[in-house]
A protein has these predicted regions:
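Mature catalytic domains of secreted/periplasmic carbohydrate-active enzymes
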Residues: 1-150
């Protein structure tokens, strides 16, 4: 359910989660557990959902992007064995900084034009985690790669 919510926000939409009460007015145990788990995750990571929108970045197999002001959020559902998350940024966009929402700074390496690797920490995450990217986007980017002239 959480992945569906994140997917909807990453595409510029929203999602309504509807739990219908039983005849006695109570909710099913499974529904209560789902709502509690979503609420717990949102308390820690809601910054990547609330007031966020479509980022316009190429989707990667590890998860989704959302966007708010000068930040892009990486919501990681599939942690790669390589411990490297590939991030392909739009033209003239640079990643300035990457931090987990708990404040831990991440190592970012530019690997090619418009492509970075973000090193995943050694922590054992039991649920999807979020990395906040501070970005700079301008026509006068200091990118060291140049367009090929043909």
């Amino acid at each position: 359910m959480l992945e569906r919510i994140v997917h909807a926000v990453s595409m510029g939409g929203n999602m309504v989660v509807n739990f219908g009460p039983q005849a006695d007015g109570d909710f099913r145990t499974e529904e209560k557990e789902i709502a509690k788990a979503i609420g717990k995750w949102m308390q820690k990571n809601g910054e990547c959902i609330y007031a966020c929108d479509y980022a316009g970045w190429e989707k990667q197999a590890w998860g989704y992007y959302t966007h708010k002001k000068n930040s892009v959020y990486m919501i990681v559902f599939n942690r790669p064995y390589s411990k490297q998350l590939t991030v392909k940024v739009p033209k003239e966009t640079q990643i300035i900084n990457a931090i987990l929402l708990n404040g831990e700074k991440m190592k970012v390496t530019e690997t090619a034009r418009n492509e970075y690797n973000v090193r995943v920490p050694k922590q054992d995450f039991q649920e999807p985690f979020v990395i906040k990217l501070e970005i700079k986007s301008s026509k006068t980017s200091t990118n060291k790669y140049y367009e090929a002239l043909t």
